[in-house]
Amino acid sequence: MGGSSASRNQSSLLEDTHTSRSLISRLFSRSKTRHITDFHIRPVDPHRKYAKGDHVTGAVVLTVLRPIRITHLTVALHGFVKVFKSPNAAHEATINTAQIASGVTNRTRYLGNGLASLFQDEQVLSADGKLEAGRYEFNFDLVFPSKVNLPTSIDFERGTISYMISATLTRPTSITPTTVCDRKIYLVEKVDIGSIPAPRPRTISLEPISRRTRRRRTDRPSTLGGADRGSSLGDSHDVTSSDLDSSRAPESVAAESNIANDAAFEGQQAPQSPTRTEMPDVMSEVSTESAITSSSAGASVGYKVSEATGSSSGSQFGARTPTVEEKTITASVEMLKGGCLPGDFVPVKISVHHIKRIKSVHGVIVTLYRQGRIDSAPPISSFQGLSKEDVRRLEKEEYFPRSKTGLSGLSLSSAGSCSVFRKDLSQAFGPLIIDPITLDASVTISVRVPEDVFPTIKGVPGELISFKYQMEVIVDLGGKLASQISSVQSKAGGISAGGAMPSARNPYESGGSSIMGSWGNSIIDTDQLRRHKGVISVVFEVPVGSVDSSRQRTRGGSLRPNPQARQPSQATESSQIPTVGYGPEDKQRAQSEPAGQEDYVHSHGSQGNGPMGPSTEYVPSPYYTPHDPRQQHAPIYIPPPDVPNDMGLSEKERARRAEQRLLPSQPPAAPFASTLSETTLEDIYNVEDDAAAGPSSAPIVGNSNGVATAPTLDEVESGEAAVGNSEDKLERERHRLLQEASAPPDFPEDYDTGDPGPSNQGPVTSATAPALSFQPSAPILSEDDEDPGSSYFNQHTSTGDYMGAGALGRPITAPHEPLPRYQR
């Protein structure tokens, strides 16, 4: 018995040891029954951002260890929208791609529980058969639909818009017959902002309300009981609360319609403020006198917000004063751009007409924010193409039952299916300083759109997910917002808390017309600032796109006009020669004229031939040197230099010839240079423009090395290869005069020649003026002069040419003072 028990214990110990070893071996060793080791999708361009209508190519990689039988292998490209009911639901369950409809379809389907299918494109890679051991790659080519609105891919804590490539391998087995692998790709919706116009400007008027002639109701009894006393207090509450509520602007776009309703409700027996629910009901415990005092804050005139100024007869607050228009505050807010791209600046112009002088350092606050909206249980009626069975199934599976009236029965506000959230992206501040003379102020503030934002998302089926960008403009018409911002800074505890407003300027902002106060992550909360008295708020929607066709047309689509097409006829040239001045009077006259009268090519000659469209070309400053229209002929063709063939030469010889081609031309002979020096000695400022003044512009006499150089413009015009030394002095002088006549003036016309005369004398515009008129203005100093400045001043003040016409405040010397020549 003892031996049998010992053998039994030993056998059980051996079985336990074998079992433990088998478990360890299963953990660390590859399973022998596994037939497929690798199954994944490899797209050709995995990091590409696709658009609708693009082709998605790639391959499905499959590695088989043992021969297996398959039913079919398919690959599908599909897009879907999923909204989670809670922020934690994104990590609880994954989306079952098998639930999405199979096949090729471009129709949107709602599958319930916040899941909707956008489209699906399926392709069969392999049919029924047997796969031997090896590595297989099945290529595919899928297409995004081009006629379906596909929103941009996005993943966030409350939902997702995803596009995936799913490969499904089906085997003829009862246990796990399908094997699925997914690969996510990204799509960006093409939102063109080039054709979006700028929104209409919003105008808000604050009209005065006189409280001193307020009428009391006569149907009230003289003694106030409990109910009557409460009614009287309620009436005073209505008056004061309406004034308080109407003195501030609406907080959203939906509340803008309430501004116009404020004036309509004013004439009723029991006026109700459109924003009554936002204020606590604390006015019923105070008296009428204290209520008026607290609401007016020491002032006897209040204001109400309205879209247009007008009188409302029968108002219970009393008759209007005759100076209503004079005491009306008007604020106009205009967004200067209809749309923007990531990284752009969005300018906003604020114009205020006030009744008194105010100065607010932070009077204008512009905030760019993104507003997202999700709906986990959209109405089934928003989806088309659902069968009766699908409608019946979706009504049973709907988490939030809806009644026929649309009120959803008795439910809490937090139990709704819609959620709206806001994310502040950028903020800018600007001062509001009213001019004490005109009582007007105009401020332009630019807000920069961050570069990492995604385009506006709209048009999702059932409005499951939507993202839009809005611009909130807050204007302090009371001048008391600076103290509130400072209190917010003190409560926030500094700039690091994120609630303070730094004084740093936008590093990307250029130009002094726009103001950018805040930059970075320090964005203050404007929710409390909107509720202050005398503060108005206007909201614009800013579409953020991905492309701008208007910029592309401006860069590459516009063609410069042909100068020959604008060439005037010879008969009208003499009568339509433009006169471009350079003096102060001419500058003022040029600024007062419209910019369309002078474009880059000076098309003045075609003004009388017919109407011209608006010019989009660059308009130069009047101080630039203009081209003479009498010289606007056909462009002269300059042939390329005749470079000899140096294929047979050595590398050293080719380098030497290339170096010689970079050197200037050889100077002329000594006798020729001596005669030219006498001709050009007086005109020392036009040396660079003369044809034979310097070595670089002298004609080519000869080249001992035989290296070809490009012919000059003078050679092409005269038709000669070179100007020989045999030409006489008169011929060379004629060439020089022709070049001076065709060249633009070297000096602006505001350069006074020093001739004393009346101030209204026009500047010398002739290009062939003698060189004596351009003499230097430096005085000649001698060693005997102790105080050359005083003698110089006395000399020119006596002649009256110290401040000549067009001198621009600089001393002008007489033309008889030559410039000292340079001597080595």
Curated annotation (Swiss-Prot):
| Source taxon at top rank | Eukaryota
Q: Name one GO biological process term.
A: ubiquitin-dependent endocytosis
Q: What Pfam families does this protein map onto? A: Arrestin_C (PF02752), Arrestin_N (PF00339)
Segments of skewed composition (Basic and acidic residues): 235-248, 649-660, 726-738
Query: GO molecular function terms here?
Result: protein-macromolecule adaptor activity; ubiquitin protein ligase binding
The record's similarity note reads: Belongs to the arrestin family. PalF/RIM8 subfamily.
* Annotated function: Required for the proteolytic cleavage of the transcription factor RIM101 in response to alkaline ambient pH.
> What name has this protein been given in UniProt?
pH-response regulator protein palF/RIM8
Native organism: Pyricularia oryzae (strain 70-15 / ATCC MYA-4617 / FGSC 8958) (Rice blast fungus)
